[in-house]
Structures are given as structure tokens and as C-alpha cells.
Amino acid sequence: MIQTKDIIELTDTYGANNYHPLPIVISKAEGVWVEDPEGNRYMDLLSAYSAVNQGHRHPKIINALIDQANRVTLTSRAFHSDQLGPWYEKVAKLTNKEMVLPMNTGAEAVETAIKTARRWAYDVKKVEANRAEIIVCEDNFHGRTMGAVSMSSNEEYKRGFGPMLPGIIVIPYGDLEALKAAITPNTAAFILEPIQGEAGINIPPAGFLKEALEVCKKENVLFVADEIQTGLGRTGKVFACDWDNVTPDMYILGKALGGGVFPISCVAANRDILGVFEPGSHGSTFGGNPLACAVSIAALEVLEEEKLTERSLQLGEKLVGQLKEIDNPMITEVRGKGLFIGIELNEPARPYCEQLKAAGLLCKETHENVIRIAPPLVISEEDLEWAFQKIKAVLS
């Protein structure tokens, strides 16, 4: 059997150097546990950046994949499929929106949101041609495509990729007055993460989302929530916006929408917004394919049937409380909602992630000095306690 060092050597030899993974190869996975080629087991505390909320290889989702793969996998959007309509209905009811537009990856859904907002600004709001603006927040992460990179405040993400998309206005995260000042007659949308993931589990001030939505309503600006990481139970609510009782004009969804099995993403909004598209104005050959839709329907059913949102809330509250009790001045803050938790240190976090790997836990540093804790929501209380004891030992 090929070994870890051989796989890493092949990756380093032939792969583009655009990631810096921990030195581990995962060859098997089930639930919250993964295994390397040598048979060493680790607990997954990253969940593929919250794409595996339902756990690795959930039986119901895998069965849906196999069943659909044995019938039809791809039709393109030139034809209807028997899975797309039911999936539309499922997502529309979940988001309480009238229309859904499917894509594949989160970044594609973000690009779709940008196109939607701009066309809405021109066709509905009557902004002068090519003058539409979009407001975003500092330290955001919306993906790696050109529109998403143009919205980033991280200059390293932009280096060598210019020119950037015009009409992007960046404001401090959670700053209501800055939002008010940034809005002009040309503003199409305010796009934000209700909790910033890559920024280190950055939570806005209480009430900010609600107040920001009110400002956007008053100024006729679309309030767009990127719930790719935070949605579908991760924060202890179905959507992180629910913490402020906010329903955005548009949701951007991805990651756990495919149950950690197959990529699928979408934007969801009402007809007065998504209705700006007509045939040929946007699309994707694989977007909304029957295999992805069948998997996604099963993934959403698992979230509901196994009450994973409620589980995330309960276990997350307990874990945050435990982590806050670790006595070490190196820890500057523990913050999170549900099982979306950041441990901020006053020094680089990567060495501690490597120590946690040696202890049998897989997690990843984010924003340089934050350890992100985001296990699959199916994790048992006993397994989470085991993980906490390992974290405590490393950070104490």
C-alpha cells in the first residue's frame, strides 16, 4: 500500500503550491474520525471548513449518492431532471425564499450573488450603467475567484491578479456608521458573512445584523448573507443570521449543502431579485445536476432528522465554556457560536495545530493566530469531551 510520505512526495512534485496542508494523508473517514494509510486514527475538528456538518460518509447521504449514480448523474440544464424540482422546493422552504439558483462551489455562488446584485441595481433600482457598487467588510473571505478576490481586503490574495473588479467598497466589520457612510445611490448590495470564518471566527456586535438590515431596507440596498460556512446548523442555528432574527434579501449557501459528499451551492432570494435573470444570462453545466440534488436533499434531511442544529448549540455552549476555563495567558480569547469556535492566541497557532495532530486531533490555524474548532455536528458528547481533554493538555 502506498504510504503517507509517498503521497506527500507526489503532491509536492506535481501539485501547484497553492495550499500549505498539515503533513497528513487521509485515506479513510467515517463520522468524526479519519484514518491515514498507516492506520493511525484522528478526530476531524475542521469538517472540511464546515462542509462535513453531517459527518464523513453519512449512510443516508451515501445511499442517496449510490442510488442516483445508478440512474442518471448529469443532464445539463438543457433538459429537466427529476431531482432538480424537489431540490428547489426543499431549499426554497428552508430559506423561506421564492427562487433558488444552483451552482457547484461556494465561490461560484458568490459570483452569482454579485451578478444578481448588479443586474438588480440596473434593472430594478435604475442605477446608471456600469456604476453599481457593492459594500463588503474588512477581513472577509468569499472565495478565490476574481469577483471574490476583488472583494477581499487581504492584499496577498490580490497580488499578481489585477486589475480587480471595480465598484467594491470595503468597510470595517460590524461598523454600522461606516455602512451608513458608504452607501450611495449606486449601492447595489451589502455582502457579508454573519460570522467571519477565515478571519478567526469573528462575531459582529450584538444587534449589528438587524441594524444593518434596517439600514439596507431604508436605502434600497440588498442585504446578502454569505452563509456558506456558517449556514446549515454550524453555529447552533439553521443560519447564523438567525442569531439576530434576520432574514437577508439573499442567502449564499454551499459546503454542507452537499453533505461532504458532492459539491453543490446556490443563492436563494425572492422573485423580485432573482427574477432579473432570463435564459442565457447565467448558468452552469453541472449546476443543479441530478446527482448533486439527490445528495443535497438527503443532506438536508439528515440535518433535520438528527436535530444537528440543536446538537451544535448544546455541545458548542458546553465546549466554549470549557475552553474559557483553560488557564494560560497565551490564550487571549475564546469565541464562537455552536460548534464554530475560535481560540485566539498571542502567538502563531500553527505549532499548536501540529501538536494537536500528534495528540490525535486535526484542526487548522486561521488568521495566523487562531485555532479553529469545527467538528462534524454528529460528534458525540463523549468524543467531544475526549477532544477537549487533548486540547487542554496541549494549551496548558
UniProtKB/Swiss-Prot annotation:
Keyword Translocase in annotation: no
Pathway terms, separated by semicolons: Amino-acid biosynthesis; L-proline biosynthesis; L-glutamate 5-semialdehyde from L-ornithine: step 1/1
HAMAP family in alphabetical order: Ornith_aminotrans_3
Catalysed reactions, as listed in the record: a 2-oxocarboxylate + L-ornithine = L-glutamate 5-semialdehyde + an L-alpha-amino acid
Cellular localisation: Cytoplasm
UniProt cross-references to InterPro entries, sorted A to Z: Aminotrans_3, Aminotrans_3_PPA_site, Class-III_PLP-dep_AT, Orn_aminotrans, Ornith_aminotrans_bact, PyrdxlP-dep_Trfase, PyrdxlP-dep_Trfase_major, PyrdxlP-dep_Trfase_small
GO term, biological process aspect, one: L-proline biosynthetic process
GO cellular component, one term: cytoplasm
Enzyme Commission designation: 2.6.1.13
Lineage start: Bacteria, Bacillati, Bacillota, Bacilli, Bacillales
One Pfam family this sequence matches: Aminotran_3
GO MF annotations in UniProt: identical protein binding; ornithine aminotransferase activity; pyridoxal phosphate binding
Chain positions with N6-(pyridoxal phosphate)lysine modification: 255
Record protein name field: Ornithine aminotransferase
